Amino acid sequence: MLKNLFRKTKYITVSQKNIENYKRENTPTIPDGMWVKCNKCGEILYQNDLEKNYMACNLCGNHFRIGAKERIKYLFDKDTFKEWDYKVKTENPLSFKGYDEKIENIKEETNLSEAVTTGKGKIADMEVVVCIMDSKFMMGSMGSVVGEKITRAIERAIELRLPVIIFTVSGGARMQEGILSLMQMAKVSSALAKLDEEGLLYICVLTDPTTGGVTASFAMLGDIILAEPDALIGFAGKRVIEQTINEKLPEDFQKSEFLLEHGFIDKIVPRSDLRKVLAKLINMHKNSF
């Protein structure tokens, strides 16, 4: 009797592998990319709803960063956009170590030829020339090919007597190309001066973030300057400026709302209204084309 009292209890043993298999089979699976977290308010958003809302949070209005392909889809009449100069190739003029490999890798990852897509299309049946920068390609940095493609697009707009719209997003000049990158500021600005002499319309749409040499040149030369809500727009970084002037800057400094309040831009336009606003502006100025 005492022997049975202190007998070791027998347990059913389950291997760790069986437990993991059970969890895997009985846990609901959610496909990758179905839900997205808003980086401003923290709301979990259904991807399909987000796309229907032009990639803007339906709770706080935060505008997610989008690429050139998405902008083309949202902006132009269906099947009217024709891309220009996609075969223009980036070189490595300074023989910067690793630059060639980096460019090829980014091309493969993004399926983009460079940090800007240029071409012609129709908005509400009105033809326009457009240049759309893309942050996925080296943070939209401005190298010699970016400057060349934008300049060519402006020159074609002059030949075709069409308005120009440029969507900016950039971290600034591309350091791997040195002075050749910086000279694109003057090159594009010079082409825009010719566009202005011809009396043609130039609209610039500033998106998050627009900084550095792009801000210091063609981003701020538009006849009409629009911006998306809460976009970061500036030349040097906020902390750099604070350390230089030894003063604390306003919390919303370099945001599109701050720039509108101080007269640097003309209007803040939510992405969902952008096509309608651009169509209205082009229609108002079409007699000058």
Curated annotation (Swiss-Prot):
Q: Which domain of life is it from?
A: Bacteria
**Which residues are listed for Zn(2+) binding in this entry?**
38, 41, 57, 60
Q: Pfam families, alphabetically?
A: Carboxyl_trans, Zn_ribbon_ACC
Record GO terms (molecular function):
acetyl-CoA carboxylase activity; ATP binding; carboxyl- or carbamoyltransferase activity; zinc ion binding
* Cross-referenced SUPFAM superfamilies: ClpP/crotonase
Instruction: Name its cellular compartments.
Output: Cytoplasm
GO CC terms? acetyl-CoA carboxylase complex
Paste the cofactor note.
Binds 1 zinc ion per subunit.
Q: Looking at the keywords, is Metal-binding present? A: yes
Name the catalysed reactions.
N(6)-carboxybiotinyl-L-lysyl-[protein] + acetyl-CoA = N(6)-biotinyl-L-lysyl-[protein] + malonyl-CoA
What EC designation does it have? 2.1.3.15
Q: What pathway does this protein act in?
A: Lipid metabolism; malonyl-CoA biosynthesis; malonyl-CoA from acetyl-CoA: step 1/1
Q: Which InterPro entries match?
A: AcCoA_carboxyl_beta, Acetyl_CoA_COase_Trfase_b_su, ClpP/crotonase-like_dom_sf, COA_CT_N, Znf-ACC
Under PANTHER family, the record lists: ACETYL-COENZYME A CARBOXYLASE CARBOXYL TRANSFERASE SUBUNIT BETA, CHLOROPLASTIC
Q: What does this protein do?
A: Component of the acetyl coenzyme A carboxylase (ACC) complex. Biotin carboxylase (BC) catalyzes the carboxylation of biotin on its carrier protein (BCCP) and then the CO(2) group is transferred by the transcarboxylase to acetyl-CoA to form malonyl-CoA.
Quaternary assembly: Acetyl-CoA carboxylase is a heterohexamer composed of biotin carboxyl carrier protein (AccB), biotin carboxylase (AccC) and two subunits each of ACCase subunit alpha (AccA) and ACCase subunit beta (AccD).
For this entry, the protein name equals: Acetyl-coenzyme A carboxylase carboxyl transferase subunit beta
Q: Which organism is it from?
A: Clostridium botulinum (strain Loch Maree / Type A3)
